[in-house]
Design a protein with these regions (language model features):
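Short, conserved catalytic or interaction motifs in soluble domains
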Residues: 16, 50, 219
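N-terminal pre-Walker A segment at the start of P-loop NTPase domains
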Residues: 1-15
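Phosphate-binding P-loop
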Residues: 16-22
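Conserved lysine of the Walker
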Residues: 35
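Electropositive, glycine-dotted interaction segments
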Residues: 88-224
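Hydrophobic anchor at the beta1->P-loop junction of P-loop NTPases
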Residues: 27
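The conserved Walker
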Residues: 31
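Conserved P-loop NTP-binding catalytic core
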Residues: 40-108
């Protein structure tokens, strides 16, 4: 399974963004153009679907709905934060759409405004449904994050849960104070640990392929070692 198309509204510094996703995608732009914000859409879906995650947690990690939602939101898409992805899994085509709004009262929690799942043109889920209308607290969670509710589209949840993000920062990799860190730190504090844990034969093969690619792309480059 892989994502083939992405559309989003009111995400970070983007009013609207939409593009196809090939097997390999390069995102190029000047500093502060929003490259990391764009990639964070995929991390956002992973944080919702992942173990111990969920919609509330994914939004809180980013500083709350005010931080995540674009300043354009007041005049765009009714103020909703919208993520709409198309996926391909063999012969099957999937679509997952999530629209989020503020609760509008109390702590203004993020709630589901719309959640849609379509497989091969057949609608598997559309929220809010009758249960949501009877108990609005249910809208504080997506069905994507609930094992009891995502049976018919669990392959999507599992796919999002496997999303990985790496943004290696040399200063963090070399920082001795970060010798003991949580696993899978995206900024590389456990990068050396991961390298050492990789089988030498596998590690050498990977480094060899990287070295060949760098020789072809970087004038004067000779070796990684």
């Amino acid at each position: 399974m892989r994502i083939t198309h992405l559309a989003a509204s009111n995400w970070r510094n983007f009013k609207n963004v939409e593009f196809d996703v090939g097997e390999r995608l390069f995102i190029v732009g000047p500093n502060a153009a929003g490259k990391s914000n764009l990639l964070d859409i995929f991390r956002f879906l992973a944080d919702i679907a992942g173990q111990g995650g969920g919609l509330a947690s994914a939004v809180d990690r980013r500083g709350g709905l005010k931080k995540v939602r674009s300043l354009f939101a007041r005049t765009n898409a009714k103020g909703r934060l919208v993520v709409d992805v198309t996926l391909r899994d063999g012969d099957d085509s999937w679509r997952y759409r999530l629209s989020v709004k503020g609760e509008g009262k109390g702590p203004n929690r993020p709630v589901v405004d719309e959640e849609l799942v379509v497989k091969n043109g057949e609608e598997l889920l559309r929220r809010p449904d009758d249960r949501d209308l009877m108990d609005e607290v249910l809208l504080t969670q997506t069905h994507l994050e609930q094992i009891a509710s995502n049976q018919s589209f669990r392959s999507i949840a599992d796919y999002f849960d496997r999303v990985q993000y790496f943004h290696l920062v040399p200063q963090i990799i070399r920082d001795p104070s970060r010798a003991v860190v949580a696993d899978d730190d995206p900024f590389g504090s456990d990068f050396i640990t991961q390298m050492n844990a990789t089988a030498p034969r596998t590690r050498d093969a990977w480094l060899g392929r990287m070295q060949q690619a760098l020789r072809a792309a970087v004038p004067g480059f000779e070796s990684l070692t």
